[in-house]
Design a protein with these regions (language model features):
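Glycine-rich anion/phosphate-binding loops
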Residues: 1-5
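Catalytic domains of cell-wall/extracellular-matrix polysaccharide-remodeling enzymes
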Residues: 7-84, 96-103, 110
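Catalytic grooves of carbohydrate-active enzymes
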Residues: 14, 100-133
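Conserved, mostly hydrophobic/aromatic
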Residues: 21, 119, 156
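Active-site beta-loop-alpha junctions enriched in small/polar residues
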Residues: 24-26, 54-57, 88-93, 122-126, ...
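C-terminal domain-boundary segment and adjacent tail
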Residues: 49-50, 133-175
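Short, glycine/charged-rich beta-strand-loop motifs at protein surfaces that mediate ligand recognition
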Residues: 91-97, 107-108, 139-142
Length: 175
C-alpha cells in the first residue's frame, strides 16, 4: 500500500493528475490483498483503476482460465468497487503478418459484447534498440501501423465503435 500511494503522490506532487491506475500485467490481481489495496486507493483518490466487472460469470470464467485467481472474495470486492469498471479487458492479438494481425484484431473486436472494453497495445517505432529489448518488437511495430490504418478507422466507424479514454469514462460516470 505504501508503494502504491507513494507512486500516485509523486505524480500528483509533480503537477499531474493520473487518468487512471493500472495493474501492469495484472499484478494487482495476483492476490486478494493486493487487489483490496488497489481498489481502495483508487476510490480514495477518485482515480479509476482498470478494474473488471466480474458479475458476468462468462467474463469471470475467462479470466480464471487465463490464470487469474478470482476467488469469491475477489468477485465480491469488484462488485463493491464504486468507480467505473470495464466489461472486458484484452490485448491486441498477435499475427504472423501485418494483415493477419489486423484480421485477428477485427475478429477480437467483433466478438465483444457492447460495453466498455480496454484493449491494450504497445505501438512502437522499429529501431535497433527496440529489437534488443523485446522479442515482440515486430508485433509492436505492426500495432503502431494498425491504429493509423484507414481500414481500421473505417472498421470502427462501420461498427459503431467509440474510442474513449479514462478521463471521458470518469466524466460520464460523474454525470
Amino acid at each position: 500500500e505504501t508503494e502504491v500511494r507513494a507512486q500516485i503522490d509523486k505524480v500528483i506532487a509533480a503537477g499531474y493528475r493520473p487518468s487512471h491506475i493500472d495493474t501492469h500485467m495484472g499484478t494487482m490481481y495476483g492476490s486478494p490483498e493486493y487487489l483490496r489495496v488497489f481498489l481502495k486507493i483508487a476510490e480514495e483518490y477518485g482515480i479509476p483503476a482498470n478494474a473488471i466487472d466480474l458479475s458476468d460469470e462468462k467474463v469471470a470464467d475467462f479470466f480464471r482460465k487465463s490464470g487469474y485467481p478470482l476467488t469469491p472474495e475477489v468477485v465480491e470486492m469488484m462488485a463493491g468497487y464504486s468507480l467505473p469498471k470495464l466489461d472486458f479487458f484484452s490485448s491486441v492479438p498477435d499475427g504472423d503478418s501485418y494483415e493477419n494481425k489486423k484480421e485477428n484484431f477485427f475478429r477480437l473486436v467483433s466478438s465483444l459484447n457492447p460495453g466498455l472494453t480496454e484493449i491494450i497495445f504497445h505501438p512502437s517505432v522499429e529501431t535497433d534498440n527496440l529489437k534488443t529489448i523485446t522479442g515482440s518488437w515486430q508485433q509492436r511495430v505492426w500495432e503502431a501501423q494498425l491504429f493509423s490504418d484507414p481500414a481500421v478507422k473505417k472498421f470502427f466507424a462501420d461498427n459503431g465503435i467509440i474510442i474513449t479514454n479514462w478521463r471521458e469514462v470518469m466524466q460520464r460516470h460523474k454525470n
